[in-house]
Structure formats: structure tokens, C-alpha cells
Amino acid sequence: MAGNGIFISFEGSEGCGKSTQIRRLAAFLQTLGREVLILREPGGTPIGETIRHLLKHDKNAAAMTPEAELLLFAASRAQLVREVIRPALEKGMVVLCDRFLDSTTVYQGVARALDSSDVAAINSFAVGELLPDLTLLLDLDAEEGRRRAASRGEPVDRMEQEDAGFYEAVRRGYLDLAREYPGRITLIDASLDEEGVAALISNKVSLRLEGQAHGVI
């Protein structure tokens, strides 16, 4: 956390409802008088959005190696942290980010099976000392997540084309992270209906904001 701002990241596999819940939380925070900035990864800056297209939609992306993928995600994040996130936090804003470094730890480090120490070093280089004050992990059965994602009827990007085994590994990786960092990562049951998930999130964030007001985070 910097200034009076607070940095909240949302994590989870495909179809878990992150985008919907980010919008709902933003609306809730605005009713409390907080200034909110919504970001996504990769993306959030002109450079980041170019990298996003390359990672997800470029015609040559199918040939991308896991190592190149890791470095591109890190490049987008490094730009986002310095160009957008840190300045917003210094202004006292609440930053809501759709994915952050935990996605890289899980997708590239676990599901792509890259060396965990290499992934950690690259993550650290990209973000410096900046970590989310709170990470909301929307946990959902991998097959249910794939079903929900498919039901949206939207074009499928390169990452969403991975097989069931890939997304089972993603979920396991996230749950391991939640056990490793219980003070930062809060597990949210994304199998609940939209209202139920939103209530869990708003309650958790309200508690964190109260803690911030009393100087305990």
C-alpha cells in the first residue's frame, strides 16, 4: 500500500466471474466515497495492451514458448506498476486489478511447469516491492469454470484453449498459494450465485478498509 490507497487483486481460473465481481465491488466502493481504478492484466497501458494482443490473439502466438510467455506477462506488469498502479495508490485510490503476479506463479510456474525460482525472480523484478494489500481468489471447479466460460459465447483466446489438465493444475496452484499466504489471499467460493459472491467480497473488503482506517494495514 502507498499513500492512502489500497491495492486489491482478483485471481481465479477462467469462468470464475472475476470481471463481474470487480465491477460490483467498484460500484460498492464508490458508494463509500472511494475513488476506484479498474485494471486488467496483461494490459492497462498502451504497451500492456499491445502485449495482451500478442499473448492472446496474435496469429503467431501458438508458437510461443512458455519462457517467452512468462517474460511478456512480466513486461506488461512492470509497465503497469510504474506507469499506473503506484501513482494511483499515491493519490489514495482503490486499485482493483484483474490478475497480478499470482497468475504468473500459477499459470507459468505451475501449469506450464517453469522453474519456480525463475518465475519468482522475474515476478520480483517486474513489481519491485509492490504486492496487493488483499488478493481475492475466486475458487471454482475447473470443469465448471470451463463450462461457464464457454456459455458466454465469446471468441476463445489462446489461453482459454488449454485442456482440462491445464486448468486442474491452475486450480491446484492457486489453492497452494492461498495456503502459503493466508494473510494476503482470501478464498472466495465462486460456486455461489453472483449475489452471494458479491456479499462475501464486500464484507471482506469492508473489514480491510476498517483496518486501513485504524492503521493496521
Where are these regions (language model features)?
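Pre-Walker A (Motif I) flank of P-loop NTPase domains
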Residues: 3-7
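Hydrophobic anchor at the beta1->P-loop junction of P-loop NTPases
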Residues: 10
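Walker A (P-loop) phosphate-binding loop of P-loop NTPases
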Residues: 15
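Hydrophobic positions on the alpha1 helix immediately C-terminal to the Walker A/P-loop
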Residues: 21
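ATP-dependent small-molecule kinase phosphotransfer cores
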Residues: 34-127, 200
